[in-house]
Amino acid sequence: MADPASYRPQTGEIPTNPGVYRFRDPHGRVIYVGKAKSLRSRLNSYFANPGGLLPKTYAMVHAASSVEWTVVASELESLQLEYTWIKEFKPRFNVVFRDDKTYPYLAVTMGEKFPRVQVLRGERRKGTRYFGPYTAGAIRETMDTLLRVFPVRSCSPGVLKRAQASGRPCLLGYIDKCAAPCVGRVTPEEHRALAEDFCSFMGGEAKRFIGRLEKDMAAAVAELDYERAARVRDDIIALRKVFERNAVVLAEDTDADVFALHEDELEAAVQVFHVRGGRVRGQRGWVVEKVEDFTTPDLVEHLLQQVYGEEGETQGRLPREVLVPEEPSNAAELAQWLAGLRGAKVDIRVPRRGDKAALMSTVRENAEHALKLHKSRRAGDLTNRSLALQELQEALDLPVALLRIECFDISHVQGTNVVASMVVVEDGLPKKSDYRKFSITGAAAVDDTAAMHDVLTRRFRNYLQEKAAQAEAAQLPGHQAALEAMAVASMQDTTTPAPRAKFAYPPNLVVVDGGKPQVNAAARALAELGIDDVYVVGLAKRLEEVWLPDSDFPVILPRTSEGLYLLQRIRDEAHRFAITFHRQKRGKAMTVSALDSVPGLGEAKRKALLAQFGSVKSIRTASAAELATAKGIGPSLADAIVSHFSNGAAASGAEAPSINMTTGEIIET
């Protein structure tokens, strides 16, 4: 661990202006981002008395090796820049509000051609609108009820594709719980309108739809169409059943998010009730570990910044009013920022009396229970993870803590479609954003040891190249000023995805799936690159033996060892990730077509040609002028297709049919 005094800047070097600062570790990775009204005052607080810092802050300043700062013109700019950098760098020590994944959400995938209604847990996806959370039983009942009135697609992509191919809808299409856009019963536009109505109802516009259905029922009765009137009546009953589940808690015109929190010295639990049209439409929860000695206003500020920053990107459904337990720091600037995301005014208020204060008390009770539940669950989980990492470090006699572990696995079928996977574990938990896949070809695909050597060489060669590039860039004149200018210029942009991390951060331990040959191949790859601070082990299947490089005998860990269990989980995750990629690659190779090798002809254009001409045989005999009439096929590409087939026929002397390699069926006739 670094001594903070070794990189502490001179007090006179630090400006007193507002700004944003970044702590970096020895590998150059940003590990913490913060903002301050006075950079000098805030940064000096980290170095004046390190022993008096909170445990996590103490760990942060000792894990860092440098600190940088950027001066901005106002506190609003510092708020925006801090959010931008946290989103870009994902610093490990920053306050992160982790979703409570106990309850599922009702989600509508509006980003798809045919929007799909489904039940989802976990992280939010772009282009998807969420409602809830609900209990598992309630959400299934709600979804089943609403599909009677709004028959939106709810099937998986595989079921949709099979229905499109066969021309027959699934069971839900036959029982009128799906409009069956897959077979053309409704157009994509009509189906999207159904999905929009579904979202509007869940968003609080229930009375509008119930009123519309009541008019339809009255019209059906007037026309003596009693069967249709009965169906509409049943739809009204179904909608009222869903509508009445949410009790009225505030005035009917109230749209607000009500936040409350319960905290101790190290953690805080946050709960929010989403009130739309005076009714509670959803509830969410987070738990956060404190890094600095945050006050409640500081926590509220970071909470709103993260929650609405993400929702502003994906949903744009910020309410008119945000109720909080205490006024956040920089409340005026925060309200201005939220108004920019919403496109209209947002009021941040602290309820003092009345119905809103009573609802705030209820939300606070939920936060208190959530923190108790989190601590009881986390106690066992954190203890086991810490024990596993400590056992592994001691059993392998490693001098460094295992902060980051990477595991590699090779997957193939009899030497075909050889692929490899890299999975990452940090602090005992998977870090899926750092997972990587490798395709292996040529001499490296001969056997597992050659493949393992190739993958480790590629991974760590990239690490060395990126490390060298960063070092060269840091030495260029004006590099720091250029970085700051780019950051300030981009801080208004909260919609651009953060750049994907590559290989710039090395592991403490590499685990390979295999025994002595695979371990030695991996160790040889590292030695050839001159890397001597990354340790390598292998976990052999069946006997679960742990192998070290150039060792004649394995390390045997007890079957009850938490360290062995951690290695097994990492190995199994790497195997799952590798075999999934292998199956994807093998599946693409299953269907072979003469169109696949035409230069410049992608999948969409191949489909357009087949849709217009019916078969590869017809495409082969068509002229360039005829081919150019297909969607997306220009004159130059049409000439290339004709030339490709002419050259292929001359070379082979015969036409090779397209074959489905799974069934052996000849695709074209």
Curated annotation (Swiss-Prot):
GO biological process, one term: nucleotide-excision repair
Keyword Transport among record annotations: no
Cell location: Cytoplasm
Keywords from the named record: Cytoplasm, DNA damage, DNA excision, DNA repair, Excision nuclease, SOS response
Residue ranges constituting the GIY-YIG domain according to the UniProt record: 16-95
Single GO cellular component term: excinuclease repair complex
Domain UVR: 207-242
Pfam families registered for this protein in UniProt: GIY-YIG (PF01541), HHH_5 (PF14520), UVR (PF02151), UvrC_RNaseH (PF22920), UvrC_RNaseH_dom (PF08459)
Assembly, per entry: Interacts with UvrB in an incision complex.
Main function: The UvrABC repair system catalyzes the recognition and processing of DNA lesions. UvrC both incises the 5' and 3' sides of the lesion. The N-terminal half is responsible for the 3' incision and the C-terminal half is responsible for the 5' incision.
Family label: Belongs to the UvrC family.
The name this protein goes by in its record: UvrABC system protein C
Annotated organism of origin: Arthrobacter sp. (strain FB24)
Encoding gene, per UniProt annotation: uvrC
